[in-house]
């Protein structure tokens, strides 16, 4: 070969290199832009809470398939940071903003503990002065109360070797006004919730234990056992005690009737004393979410953010692979002018503002964090790369966390796309992964989801919207708020990597606003209930209304006063609902609104139901 310079070849190589450099720069810019879209300061969250849930640690609970599980959450505000503890996670989370949760791996069990798998079950967490304390459900003498002044890292010390009185589902309450510490506990379908005072120095009881409250399911319909409060093979459970204080009153909260049910809820008794004379609050259950995508709102805790606004965190039920397959949800809460405790679960699995960006304004007398972004793809057409058996594609858009679509593999390139029906304004996307053929038991560290999100106006020409192909975090309920809303009709999720198992989705949910009209006001809304002077079931009411062809669903509001309709139930695609959660002897009031991808209708007139 000649050693003369081949200027034509050199020119071609220079041109090619320049072209490749431009392509590389375009790719880098595109990746950077997609990351900016996904990672700009996020103002909203969406239930279920997107944290790296552990898998069940119990082999006996995996006969229906290995799966993620937790429950019984407690959030405390300590030194202006939020600390989240829940059942069997081999650690806990902390956050500055209730959006980004940082996991701290920590085994609280001592080597000698009789519970080798439980770690912490239904934890009791409390702040006393400048220290955070943690204790787990135990009647053994080998589980200590732990303490930390710096819990953002694994820096814990034993406060006392054992809690001699023992407690399952413990709840501690330090009353700083009088410098006293109390313990409440119980999880039983036979025994009531118990209470005792603890010495603030020894953290032990003097032995005086007092029964405080018990279920009255013959009066309170929502306390009856079963998915529809109709299952008689077991008596209902009272559990999940929690205590807060407001305006000099003590609010003793409890969960019922069973953690696996959509109607799992938190009720509350109120007293002017921490250990006596508790009365059933007129508005009960105060935390209740039997409808929608993610259902259940029981065994939780109520806490204040850094602005002083109240929130409630509770257990969400999935209960497919096992009764104890569960997640966590957070909702705005508060007290009205009469000191009535409420939790606002209306649209409670749609995007909501985190505390930093919430104005604290009230809607219909309740604090609301709802963004107003609607679900754009309910029961809309779906296409997928493959399908595993009976796990059909449309299960990903049916607004039921219990059903899911699964691809045949968990490999890169599997995909699912949803058609919004028309070009719409998209603000946020939630990807709820399901556990199909998962291989993990217990906490799995250093695992992650990787994916790409594409958008299209015609379903043919696609533009990359979000690139998480390099993501290094575990995001089982991934929620992405776009920095700027986009106009599009089709959304596609392309799998890059799963932590384990198949690429499976129980909820591909696209939020924003369509460009049509909101539904008309619901017509012919009626409520039927047994006459108080005749035999019949007065703990239930049959609600009916005229089907609205423009509506995707409805939200029914209810309460015992037309001015205090604090309870809510979301109903998709039906024109009736059997409300089985009423109190026997009280008059109720109901109101309904319709919603679709465009927004929410005007509310109906209030209906009285004696």
Predicted feature locations:
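Beta-rich carbohydrate-recognition and catalytic domains
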Residues: 41-233, 245-292, 307-309, 315-360, ...
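Predominantly extracellular/luminal regions of secreted and cell-surface proteins
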Residues: 194-206, 360-399
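Aromatic, loop-rich ligand-recognition surfaces of beta-strand-rich domains
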Residues: 398-466, 476-523, 534, 544-546
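Extracellular low-complexity, O-glycosylation-prone stalks/linkers
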Residues: 454-455, 550-569
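Short beta-strand segments within Ig-like beta-sandwich modules, predominantly Fibronectin type-III
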Residues: 469-472, 568-574
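Extracellular Ig-like/FN3 beta-sandwich strand-entry sites
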Residues: 486-488, 551, 585-587
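Pro/Thr/Ser/Gly-rich low-complexity, intrinsically disordered linker/stalk tracts
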Residues: 511-550, 584, 598-610
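Beta-strand-rich modules
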Residues: 579-600
């Amino acid at each position: 070969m000649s050693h003369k310079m081949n200027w034509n070849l050199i020119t071609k190589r220079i041109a090619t290199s320049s072209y490749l450099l431009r392509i590389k720069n375009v790719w880098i810019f595109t990746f950077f832009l997609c990351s900016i879209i996904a990672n700009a300061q996020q103002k909203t969250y969406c239930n279920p809470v997107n944290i790296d849930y552990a898998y069940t640690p119990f082999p006996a609970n995996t006969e229906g398939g290995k799966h993620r599980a937790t429950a019984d959450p407690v959030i405390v505000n300590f030194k202006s940071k939020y600390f989240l503890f829940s059942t069997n996670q081999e650690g806990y989370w902390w956050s500055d903003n209730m959006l980004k949760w940082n996991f701290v791996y920590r085994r609280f069990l001592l080597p000698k503990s009789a519970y080798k798998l439980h770690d912490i079950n239904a934890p009791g967490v409390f702040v006393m002065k400048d220290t955070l304390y943690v204790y787990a459900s135990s009647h053994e003498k080998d589980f200590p109360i732990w303490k930390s002044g710096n819990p953002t890292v694994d820096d814990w010390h034993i406060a006392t070797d054992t809690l001699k009185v023992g407690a399952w589902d413990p709840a501690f309450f330090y009353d700083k006004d009088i410098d006293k510490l109390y313990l409440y506990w119980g999880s039983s379908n036979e025994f009531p919730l118990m209470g005792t005072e603890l010495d603030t120095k020894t953290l032990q009881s003097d032995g005086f234990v007092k029964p405080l409250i018990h279920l009255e399911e013959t009066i309170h319909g929502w306390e009856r056992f079963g998915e529809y409060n109709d299952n008689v093979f077991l008596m209902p459970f009272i559990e999940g005690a929690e205590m807060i204080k407001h305006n000099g009153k003590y609010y003793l909260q409890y969960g019922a009737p069973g953690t696996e049910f959509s109607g799992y809820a938190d009720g509350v008794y109120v007293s002017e004393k921490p250990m006596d004379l508790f009365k059933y609050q007129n508005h009960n259950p105060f935390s209740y979410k039997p409808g929608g995508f993610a259902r259940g709102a029981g065994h939780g805790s109520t806490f204040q953010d850094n602005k002083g606004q109240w929130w409630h965190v509770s257990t969400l039920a999935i209960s497919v692979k096992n009764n104890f397959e569960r997640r966590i949800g957070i909702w705005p809460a508060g007290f009205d002018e009469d000191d009535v405790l409420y939790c606002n679960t209306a649209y409670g699995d749609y995007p909501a503002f985190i505390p930093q960006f919430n104005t604290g304004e009230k809607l219909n007398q309740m604090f609301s964090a709802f963004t107003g972004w609607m679900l754009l793809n309910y029961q809309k057409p779906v296409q997928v790369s493959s399908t595993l058996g009976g796990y059909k594609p449309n299960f990903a858009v049916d607004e039921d966390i219990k059903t899911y679509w699964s691809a045949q593999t968990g490999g890169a390139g599997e995909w699912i796309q949803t058609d919004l029906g028309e070009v719409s304004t998209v603000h946020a996307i939630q990807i709820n992964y399901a556990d199909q053929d998962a291989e993990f038991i217990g906490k799995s560290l250093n695992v992650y989801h990787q994916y790409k999100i594409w958008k299209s106006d015609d379903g043919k020409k696609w533009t990359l919207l979000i690139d998480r192909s390099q993501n290094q975090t575990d995001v089982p309920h991934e929620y992405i708020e776009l920095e700027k809303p986009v106009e599009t009709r089709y959304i596609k999720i392309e799998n890059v990597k799963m932590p384990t198992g198949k690429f499976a989705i129980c909820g591909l949910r696209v939020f924003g606003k369509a460009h049509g009209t909101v539904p008309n006001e619901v017509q012919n809304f009626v409520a039927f209930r047994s006459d108080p002077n005749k035999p019949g079931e007065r703990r239930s009411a049959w609600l009916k209304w005229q089907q609205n062809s423009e509506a995707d669903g409805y939200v029914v509001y209810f309460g015992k006063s037309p001015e205090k309709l604090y309870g809510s139930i979301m109903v998709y695609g039906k024109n009736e609902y059997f409300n089985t959660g009423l109190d026997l002897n009280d008059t109720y009031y109901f109101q309904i609104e319709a919603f679709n991808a465009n927004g929410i209708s005007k509310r109906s007139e209030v209906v009285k139901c004696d």
